[in-house]
Regions:
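Short, structured beta-strand/loop micro-motifs enriched in basic residues and often containing a Trp
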Residues: 1-6
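Long, non-transmembrane cytosolic or organellar matrix-exposed soluble domains/tails
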Residues: 100-211
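Soluble accessory domains appended to multi-pass membrane transport proteins
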Residues: 11-115, 125
Length: 211
C-alpha cells in the first residue's frame, strides 16, 4: 500500500520537497524535507521531524500551501464586532466632520453618503466604505484578487464586520506584520465614526460597574 501511494503522490504532483503541508487531523504542520516511495519526512515549526507513510496523504485530506505562494497573494480574513447600540444615521454635521478630520478626510473623498434610493447611510455604512477604500488604495495589497468588506450575521456579541482581501507579500512574517498594521488602523478608525467595538467585559470593567 505504501509503495503504491508513494507512486500516486509522485505522479499526481501532490507534494514535493520544500512544500508547506498541513494535516490538522494528524497534527502535521511543516515543510516537506524528504519524499520517497515509502516515507515522507516533514520538518515541523518547532524543528521536530515527523515521518509518515505516503498512504496517509492519499487516504486523508491535507492542505498544500505551495499554491498560495505561487499565486502571489496571501489572504487576510479578519472581523471586528460592532456594538449594535452604537449604530446610528449619519447626519450632515457628522458627515462634514468626517470630511474635514485629518484621519478620515482622504478616505471620505468621493464616498457617497446616501443610497441611490435616497436612503441616508448610517455611521457603519460610511465606516465600511472608508475601510474598503483604505484596503483598495493600500500599495501592499494584491488588487488582482478578491477584496471586500461585509457584514456577517448579527450575534449576541454584536455585528461582525469582516475584512476579506489578499496581501501582495506571501512571506509569513511580512504578511503578519502587514496584517497587524492594517487591522490596528481599521480598529482605530472605528471611534471616529462613533462606532463602539464590542469586547467581553474585563476584570477592570466589572470592578468599575461594582463601584
Amino acid at each position: 500500500m505504501g509503495l503504491i501511494a508513494g507512486v500516486q503522490l509522485s505522479l499526481n504532483n501532490m507534494l514535493k520537497v520544500g512544500d508547506w503541508i498541513e494535516m490538522p487531523s494528524r497534527g502535521i504542520d511543516g515543510i516537506v524535507e524528504e519524499v520517497t516511495l515509502t516515507t515522507i519526512k516533514i520538518r515541523a515549526w518547532n524543528n521536530t521531524l515527523q515521518t509518515i507513510p505516503p498512504y496517509l496523504l492519499i487516504s486523508e485530506p491535507f492542505d498544500n500551501w505551495q499554491a498560495m505562494f505561487a499565486s502571489g497573494g496571501r489572504r487576510i480574513k479578519r472581523s471586528i464586532m460592532v456594538d449594535i447600540s452604537s449604530i446610528a444615521f449619519a447626519d450632515d454635521a457628522f458627515i462634514e466632520q468626517l470630511r474635514t478630520h485629518e484621519a478620515t478626510r482622504l478616505l471620505m473623498d468621493g464616498v457617497a453618503t446616501e443610497s441611490l434610493e435616497g436612503i441616508r447611510f448610517t455611521n457603519v455604512d460610511l465606516y465600511m466604505r472608508c475601510v474598503n477604500r483604505f484596503i483598495d488604495k493600500h500599495p501592499r495589497v494584491n488588487h488582482k484578487m478578491l477584496s471586500m468588506v461585509r457584514q456577517l450575521q448579527p450575534t449576541a456579541n454584536g455585528l461582525p464586520i469582516e475584512m476579506y482581501f489578499f496581501t501582495a507579500d506571501v512571506r509569513w512574517v511580512q504578511h503578519e506584520h502587514l496584517q497587524t498594521e492594517m487591522m490596528s488602523y481599521i480598529m482605530a478608525l472605528a471611534p471616529l465614526f462613533n462606532i463602539r467595538i464590542y469586547q467581553a467585559p474585563t476584570t477592570m470593567d466589572l470592578r468599575r460597574y461594582q463601584k
